Design a protein with these regions (language model features):
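Long, positively charged, glycine-interspersed low-complexity recognition regions
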Residues: 196-202
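Interdomain hinge/lid region at the active-site interface
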Residues: 122-191
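Rossmann-like NAD(P)(H) cofactor-binding subdomain of soluble oxidoreductases
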Residues: 1-46
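Short, flexible, solvent-exposed loop/turn segments with mixed acidic/basic and small polar residues
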Residues: 47-52, 149
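Alpha-helix N-cap/loop-to-helix initiation residues
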Residues: 15, 41, 66-67, 158
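Internal alpha-helical scaffold of NAD(P)-dependent oxidoreductase catalytic cores
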Residues: 50-138
Length: 202
């Protein structure tokens, strides 16, 4: 193929910085900035498995900067991978992904740290931790190197999402301390609505 037909696709978790870095590149129109919302807590070639992308979403950012022919070819690839395609600008992508992905990974890492700091005897963790704990800290098994890089690259949005999360945790703590358990239950009921949202996604 000629250079004009070459497709370069980025699959990283952040989009704004890489889109800025190539904005003036002579072959920018051959570039696809995408983020497949798929994966597991495992990394490396050994973690690959068939059907990983089936019915998963892939977000393409700043698509208007890509040539129509290149975009069409990329869409053909994604559709053959059985993925659902959506579009978003790179700045908005990084803002929202900080809340729905990066914050959950950060929380998983820090929950794991909190428990390990308190429970020096690993046997206590093994004997007492149930499926809820296991599912919540599952993401803490992810690659530390990769996630340190992600937290660095999207630090402004992650700090904002973390500030919001800490405010909610402090409010939750205050409700317990002040014994406002009716208000706490109401808060839990409102938050429980997220299961309907996630059911619609899945």
């Amino acid at each position: 193929k000629s250079v004009d037909d070459t497709i370069v696709i980025d699959f990283g978790s952040t989009k704004s910085s890489i889109c800025k870095s190539v904005i003036n590149h002579k072959n920018r129109s051959n570039f696809i900035a995408s983020h497949p919302i798929a994966g597991t807590e495992y990394s490396g070639p050994h973690a690959a498995h068939f059907g990983l992308f089936d019915n998963k979403n892939v977000i393409i950012c700043d698509y208007k900067k890509t040539k129509t022919k290149i975009l069409d070819n990329a869409l053909e690839i994604f559709l053959k991978m059985k993925m659902n395609v959506s579009y978003m600008d790179s700045v908005s992508h990084d803002k929202h992904i900080a809340y729905v992905s990066h914050l959950s990974h950060l929380s998983s890492f820090m929950l794991g740290k909190t428990v390990m700091d308190e429970e020096k005897n690993e046997k206590n963790i093994f004997n007492m931790a149930g499926s809820g704990f296991e599912s919540t800290v599952r993401l803490a098994k992810s690659s530390p190197k990769m996630w340190a890089d992600i937290f660095d690259d999207n630090k402004i949005n992650i700090i904002k999402s973390l500030d919001d999360y800490i405010k909610n945790l402090e409010f939750f703590k205050l409700l317990i301390e002040s014994k406002k358990f009716d208000e706490l239950e109401l808060l839990l009921n409102k938050t429980n609505y997220i299961k309907k949202i996630l059911k619609g996604i899945n």
